[in-house]
Amino acid sequence: MYKRQQQNRILAGQTFPKDKLVNAKGKKVLVIGGGDTGSDCIGTSVRQGAVSVTQIEIMPKPPVGYNPATPWPQWPAVFKTTSSHEEGCTRRWCLASNQFLGQNGKVTGVEVEEVEWIPAADGGRPTMKPTGKKEVIEADMVLLAMGFLKPEQPKFAKNVFLAGDAETGASLVVRAMAGGRKAAAEIDAY
């Protein structure tokens, strides 16, 4: 978040002292998260002159091409290589980050552990199982680009109604529309 806010201010014309800039030049960068944000972090780090860039993802490597496990209208879970990936990085899957390591207030690496995904007998969401195989990935810059499963639902007053991404997390616009209709019916009943 801090890096993005700083970059937005720079693009708007604000200047920062060199020692205050968040910059990947000369750094070993670890990107935690495999989505679009992670891809953006990779490209920016490479362009800024990172010594190395590694991207880790807790999920398994998705299949190339059509994935029968995610038919339309679900978001297709397929292997993607973006232009940022092509700029250069190491990509690894089925790794959970256990702890950040550091010295003198600066990160030096992240302890990661391989995980297995056990399919659910009922076809539902698989269960993650740590394998005990741990290693340390050296890094002096770690960028968090992780997604989320669903939004946390805080307790709202009875007269507050949610719809769309605020209720379900990022999803299809048709689901947001259905949520809007449901919220309207609840408001009407209230």
Name these PLM-found stretches:
Residues 3-190:
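Residues forming the flavin
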